[in-house]
Amino acid sequence: SSAASDVYKRQSLIGKNLDEFSDLCSELGVEDFRSKQLFNWMYRNEVSDLTELKNLPKSLIGDLKRGHCIHPLELINSTNSSSEKTNKFLFKTQSGALIESVLMNEKNRVTLCISTQVGCALDCKFCATAKMGFKENLSVGEILDQYLLARQKINKPITNIVFMGMGEPFLNYKNVIKAAKLLNDPNGINLSLIHISEPTRPVMI
């Protein structure tokens, strides 16, 4: 729809760190303490629309609406395996590409496998993604939003993150590291680094 495409032209708030929210508040001419409020809304609360940010002035909400959206991804579909041990999530990116995340329900933990690229440049014979070739790197927001939207959908804590979905994390290193830091931030999602892993294939650079 035209409304959906309009949203994709806006810059997502998810993916920004506290310094970037501070810069945004400066650009919009509002007090710096609003940056912490925005950060908390994005990563500690499950919000889908800017009108849900109740402690922010309406003037700021209006300014944000003109150039920003909350989520960079759209959840297209989610399916459960017959045993309910796995959930598969299909997302649409801001460029219109489709990516997947897989949730694994185990006895003492819930692990989400997150994609880091659309397609992959490596030709691993065991991997179906290799047949796509490399399309694009996911943004920090698109990496993080897989976690946030999956958590919202299943309505229970996700204890572990593995960057083992579509793509090679090492080839999108900067965005993956920034996403991991935001996942770990004690003022936000607060997921221990012990529970965040980045399996990688050998890469010649």
Tell where the protein language model's regions lie, with residue ranges.
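Short linear Ser/Thr-Pro motifs
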Residues: 1-2, 81-82, 115-116
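Short, small-residue-biased leader/transition segments that mark boundaries at the very start
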Residues: 1-8, 199-202
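Flexible, acidic/Gly-rich N-terminal and inter-domain linker regions that tether
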Residues: 5-110
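Conserved Radical SAM active-site core
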Residues: 97-197, 201
